[in-house]
């Protein structure tokens, strides 16, 4: 559901320094048992909370997740009492986080296309350029589907908010990321190319009003799984700006003890992806903290990517350490951008 407050007002966002922002009028009900019936939980929720001010705005039968919308001023009380009011089900209650993009426009104009040589792309193409049998989902802020980098290869496009294939341009992040993953090789000499230019592109928009609720991100990933994506790129995540001032030992303790509910949720999504032989690829994050703090990065079955600069040293912003699987160029990276142009960007997204 789009991010809205009461009466369609501005999003009721609670800003929390050092941890992800949350939407004040939503809660997640996450069923502990994979065999539980989320339809039954939805029915019992409405029996316990029959007033129209309590509503169900999303659910997923496979992830066993229910998203409810409630009055902002009742959120804390409902968190404390909802389990006892719906005693026939075991579920975890946690907040709806708001995620952000892991990339931004770069001021770099020198050595455009350096990343293509750094990863020895042409040598890699002697093995494969990808295949039209392979679908790569780009779960992001939208895409310019008409960009020449993507001609004839867009499939199963989806907007989780409008529930159709009408995608916006967003901030250009999705267009840039898609170009790096599966953009045409025709622009290699200009410094732009996808790594796997023969693959199909499945763009999935999970941003509304420049914000991505966690429920929208989960819905986007699940759409990709249900539509047979072979790879799902997720260059989106929670912000932990400011935590880099903490000693690494304290960060490690946070990674071990905090954000466990969201970690459980992602573990179930990753398990479902593994059953479908789908690879989930996450950007590690740009907060200069341990990669293991963002809970989506804690799954062995996914691939988590950190960023290096032109010297192949870690960028100043990249997350690092435990749960990092591979590093790739992420500074001054040239790729497709709206409208019908190209742009350098920085980030673990890249």
Model region roles, listed by residue range:
Residues 41-48, 78-86:
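Short amphipathic alpha-helices in soluble, non-transmembrane regions
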């Amino acid at each position: 559901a789009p991010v809205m407050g009461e009466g369609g007002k501005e999003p009721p966002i609670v800003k929390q320094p050092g941890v992800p922002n949350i939407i004040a009028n939503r809660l997640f009900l996450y069923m502990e048992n994979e065999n539980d019936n989320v339809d039954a939980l939805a029915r019992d929720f409405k029996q316990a909370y029959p007033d129209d001010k309590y509503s169900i705005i999303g659910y997923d039968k496979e992830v066993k997740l229910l998203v409810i919308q409630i009055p902002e001023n009742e959120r804390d009380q409902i968190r404390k009492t909802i389990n006892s009011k719906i005693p026939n089900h075991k579920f975890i209650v946690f907040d709806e986080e708001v995620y952000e993009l892991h990339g931004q426009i770069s001021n770099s104009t020198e050595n455009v296309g350096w990343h293509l040589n750094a990863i020895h792309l042409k040598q890699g193409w002697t093995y494969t350029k990808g295949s039209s049998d392979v679908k790569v989902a780009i779960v992001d802020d939208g895409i310019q589907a008409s960009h020449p980098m993507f001609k004839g290869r867009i499939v199963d496009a989806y907007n989780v908010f409008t529930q159709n294939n009408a995608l916006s341009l967003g901030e250009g992040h999705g267009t840039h990321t898609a170009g790096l993953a599966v953009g045409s090789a025709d622009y290699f000499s200009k410094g732009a190319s996808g790594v796997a230019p023969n693959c199909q592109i499945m763009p999935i928009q999970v941003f509304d009003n420049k914000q991505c609720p966690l429920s929208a991100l989960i819905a986007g990933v699940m759409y990709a799984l249900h539509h047979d994506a072979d790879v799902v790129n997720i260059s989106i995540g929670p912000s932990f700006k400011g935590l880099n001032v903490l000693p690494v030992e304290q960060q490690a303790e946070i990674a071990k003890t905090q954000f466990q509910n969201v970690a459980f949720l992602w573990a179930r999504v990753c398990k479902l992806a593994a059953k479908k032989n789908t690879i989930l690829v996450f950007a590690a994050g740009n907060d200069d903290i341990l990669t293991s703090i963002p809970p989506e990065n804690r799954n062995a079955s996914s691939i988590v990517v950190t960023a290096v600069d032109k010297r192949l040293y870690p960028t100043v912003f990249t997350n690092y350490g435990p749960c990092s699987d591979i590093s790739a160029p992420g500074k001054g990276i040239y790729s497709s951008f709206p409208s019908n142009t190209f742009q350098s960007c920085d980030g673990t997204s890249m």
